[in-house]
Amino acid sequence: CEAVLGNCNNLYASSKGLFLSETDYSKRAEEKTRIYRFDYTEKGVEFKCKGEIPGYINNQFSMSYDGQYFRIATTVNKRVISGNSESTQFGDAMISISTADRVNNLYILDDNMQVVGKVEDMAKGELIKSVRFVGNMAYVVTFRQTDPLFVIDLTDPKNPTVKGELKIPGFSQYLHPIADGFLVGV
């Protein structure tokens, strides 16, 4: 019997793979998220590898796996640490978050959980509220005062590109595809 011990913030499962994410909020300048990949085998579920990216994820919809590439969207908070930076996570150091320096990123990782493509620094000062992956497209909604919807083409995993940005009032916490090229935001 084998076990993998640790913390899990989110889980993404499909018929092609199982992924667990764990965000490290320790005293660093920014959060880091570790992703643990598991494969389905004749013996059951087996650990394959892990990777790490900057930031934290909103929920399981911030992750997707197409059978070859794992895609994930994160928000990165720039943090200022004052006091004893060597203290424990709940020790005497003070951490403040600079929302003006907050950015949002989308990463594409290969089967060994290494970053092969990325879009970084979207919507400075905002945070991700919802993400939806549909085929080779990613839809990312961020929020602070307006509600930008980013459309990202993932056709070339090594060179994902922002194809459009729509700014509308409010924000959507859930995106649902209803037809080719149409989304409903709730």
Where in the sequence are the language-model features?
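Beta-sheet-rich non-transmembrane sensory/scaffold domains
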Residues: 1-186
